[in-house]
Structures are given as structure tokens and as C-alpha cells.
């Protein structure tokens, strides 16, 4: 499997260890109070290091990107070791974006953790922050009988293409992309900024593309951008959409609450967005060619059947079935965990092979369980697994001759005790267990539901600790998110209830009311009972809700409303004896203010340099010249902000920079002649464009490196090269 890792190394061409060394230096500067806390926060978010609450000061959540959810068994073993060595929570958490999170990691241990991940080909870069987040893919790709083609290599290549990309690292907010191998759409195209579904037209591979979706506090379903675009142009189409957002989304950049592409599209209209995007694509195709690198990824997938599958001493199924008196076989069939195992078996399109879907409770696995699954994949699967948006794990390529041996491998290690309750069918974010924005503890509610409901009728239940939808409450059959209300002089924890979500058909759940947190499990129980009694045949839950209407469900909520509840339990969350206290923070891990203003200028400068390079290749010299000059002005203005001055004219910006900043030794190079050289290059003929480009690029690079050294007193630490 390491041969695969060598061929699809998403960090190829970059010194990932040098990046980690630089991050370690920044962490050390933070401990020594040589860097501003807000600047440090934006830096650590680039590497997926997130702040937490309810634990020792100095611990963080470390998010680990698993592109497409595709994880090798060796990588699982490494994450098991890291969980054991560094995560005070004691478990690794699978997220709804197919990431893995380690909670309560001491900040001083982060660099060592990242180096050990790098050793097995994993980077955490751009796992958080204003960037293209982990790119997700359908977990059944490669084995689905209905697939058009395997999309996992495209998700991996897309990660490689946009990782460290100037347009990705300079976004005003996060950006999400997904890939599905069929119209069954197990990766939920319509809830993403860009969602792709495999297509073949006239023998050519490509994608049906949706754009402008997203959940969060204001959910929107994506619209169809194109019925088909070929596989190579697809990646340029994404870049074109990003360029359009950067160029025309100034209003969204200035309002963080609306800095997602869905709000930009809503403002300008989808047809205008489509027009701008394809116009940008036409220009981009003149300078870009997606070819050999993509082909290298595609050639690896779909992965072939393992050459060795199953234990050497294992018995094939037909022998077990023909000799039922074998004690071990009888014990297997009588074991109460057999049904759980059997329920998770999924027939592959490859004859003679089966995949196993494992549902860990709330997506959490301890080090021992991770190692068991890694060993299981090596012994019985293909040496890899796929994480799912429902926080599950799929292990494909189990030879049908060794199904019972595979089961026994897990059963004799008591693995099924962790995945046996109804809680395993619930999707939940960690909530206030670790998140600073969360209002409630959804883990506790999920366990409360599991304790009080032996089965959930096959319903998909999604829980979030706040309106931001990390638990994807908008797309569940039943969705709940944390809230609070004032009642009788106290604050009562509640959950807002949504019904009928199904993003695979573009349907967002509808809010029907609130329920006290301690009684949310009662609503689930009575809804499941109603569902089991009243559903028609193969009716889906969203169809059931449409047929019955919301009133029967609102009547259930009314029985538990505050006005009908005088118990002290009203003020308690599930799992807590003490009364609820509102501790959520008003803003999360992406701060506003002066530093954001500076960062916007810097990011726009970087983007201009990147685009100017393409303009030069395309012969658009005037456009390239304008962007290079603008990048110098934006970066200059960024530092002048620190002096409390906001100059507007070209001359004032350059004068203030030269007079106030150039002499401070904040930057590594001498820029005392910046103003004179700027005007000289501005008035130079077009054949001097390369000189202007190189000068502006060097200046912006120096500014970027200096910004990292911003200290708590809002001064820049002197360049270490001086």
C-alpha cells in the first residue's frame, strides 16, 4: 500500500517537514509572547489546530485531513498511536467531513504529532480556517454496482491541486467540495460550494456540477452549474468559480457572516454567476493544462482485489456450513453481535467480495479499536478503509470465503460492544464537549436517546450543539441543534427540532419547534413509534412528513413545552446533575478586527500576483501590470494600518510606507526606494512586465513572512535574517 502512497502523495513538491519546523517556531514565539495571539490563531488554524474549552489551558483540537475519506491501514495505526500519546480525550473522532479529530492535545506536542503524520503521507494543512476544507467523496466509490466510475482519485487529485493554492489560502471563509460516483449521491453534492457527480458523455469522463450550496445557520441547496464538463476542465472550472468569487465578492468579504459563495451567488443571481464563471474558464484554459498528473492518479484506481485475503488457517464458508456441528460456528450464529456484523455487510460490484460498514458510537474510536480495524483491514480487506459522512468506517475487499473468520476476528476482540447500541445510528458533532461555540452537549443527548430507545426505526438522526450544523442537522430525517431559553428566572437548555431533511434530493429539514433538552429523547421515541405505526410500505421519512404534515409532531413537542413542565430537570442537560450554564462564545475561531483587515489586503496581494502570472502567459500585459501594482499598494497599506493611518491615494500609501515602515527593519529587505521604483515601473513600457512582476512578487513575499512575526503589541518582530 505504500506504493500507492508514493504515487498519490498530495505533498509532492513541497517540503512538509520545513513547514512543520516553521510552525514550531511560531508556536515557540507564541509561548515567548513574541507574536500577537490573534495572528497566532490565524496561523495555527492553517494547520488544523483549533481552540477548545472545558479543559486545561493550552490544549487544542487537532484536525487531520483524510482526503476523500481514503485512509491506509498504516495511517490508521499511526493515528491510533497519536491518540494514545497525545489526545487527553482518549479517542479519535470521525467528522461529517471525513476528517479525524484528536481532542485536548497540548500545544507543545503539536509539531511532533504533525511530523509523525507526515511520515505516513498525511498533512493537516488547511484543515481549518478560511480555505478549501477536506474534499469529501462517496464512501462506496470503487465498489458500488451503480457507479459511473471511481471518483476517489479525482478527490485526491483535487486535494493536491488546491493544497497551498493562492486562491484557496486567501478565501474570506471556508469552501467545500464533494465527489459522488453515481446519482445516488452519497457525498451530498447539493450541500457543497461545488458538488460533482460522475458522468460519461461520448466515451469521455466528466462531471455534472452543482454550485452554491452550504449548511450553517442559513442553509442553501446548490444549483446545477452544468450537466457535463470533461474531467480536465472540471478542476479549472472550480478555480474559475474561486476567481469570480474573489473578483466580484467584495461585499461578502466585508461581512464575515455572509462571506460564503452561496451568499455571493444569492446576491448576483445564479445565471450571472454561471456567465462570469464560464467566461473566466475560457481565459484560464489559455494558460493551464490538466493532464499527466491527473492521469497518474486515475491509473491507480479502482484498486484491484488483494492478492492475499483472509487468514491462511481460515475455513471457507462452504466447509463451515456443511459442518454445522463445529462448536465455533454454532457460537458465532448464537452470538448476539452477529446481527450487527451481518447488517454492515455490503455486496461489492466485484464478484466474490464484500465490504463491511462499521458504526462506532458518535464516530469515536479509542487507540485499541483503531488498531483492531487497521489489522482487520490488513488481514481481511484491502489494506485501507473509507471514512463516511455519517461518521462510520467502510472496509472493502473482504473475500466471501472468509466472512465468518472476519467476524470472529472482531468478535473475539470484543469489538462489537462499542458499536452495538442504537446510538451508533446517530450523527453528532462533539458540541460543548470541546467546541467554544456550542450551546449544548449533543454527545449526552445522543447517549440519552440510545439508552431510552432500543431501535430508531431506521431514521437518520443528526444533532449539532449550535446552529452552525457541524452535525448536519438540516439533512437528517430528524435534526436537532442546541439552543437555550429564559424561563422562570433561569436558563433552560433546549433543542430546536427539524424534520424531513434529505439532501440527496435537495431537501432541507424544516424547523417545527423546540423541546427541553432533558425531554428530547421522548420526542424521538414517540416519533419513532408514530413512524412504525403509520408509514406506508417503502415510504421515506420525508414523504411520511409531507403526507402527515407537521401538526402531529408539534403536538408531541407541546406535551413537553416549558409551560407544561415545572420540574427542576427543565434546567438540566442530559448527563448533568447541576443546572445549565450558558457558556458559548459569541464568536468562534476566526476573529475579526484590524488583523482581519490586514489579512484581506495581504491575501488580495497574493491573489493578484498569482493571477498576473497567468495574464503574462496569456499576453494580457495591461491586466498583469495593473495587478502587480495593486499588490504593492495593498501590501504597503497593510503595514500602514498598524500606525493607525488609513491612506487612500496611491501617493499617500507609498509615502506613508516609506516614511513610517521601511526604516523599522520589520521586513527582511530594504524597501526605502519602494515609491520611486513603483512609479518607475508603472511608467515603463510593456516589455518591462517581467521586472515589475518579479519586484512585486518579492515585495509581497517579504510582507507575508513579516506578518507572521506580528507581536502582541502590534509591532513586527525584526527580521531574523538581519
Task: Give residue spans per PLM region.
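Short, charged, amphipathic alpha-helical segments
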Residues: 622-629, 690-694
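Short, hydrophobic/amphipathic alpha-helical patches that form generic packing surfaces
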Residues: 243, 630-641
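Inward-facing hydrophobic residues that define packing positions of alpha-helical scaffold repeats
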Residues: 609, 616, 621, 628-629, ...
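Short, solvent-exposed positions on alpha-helices
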Residues: 539, 622-626, 648
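Long, charged low-complexity segments
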Residues: 593, 599-606, 610-614, 636-722
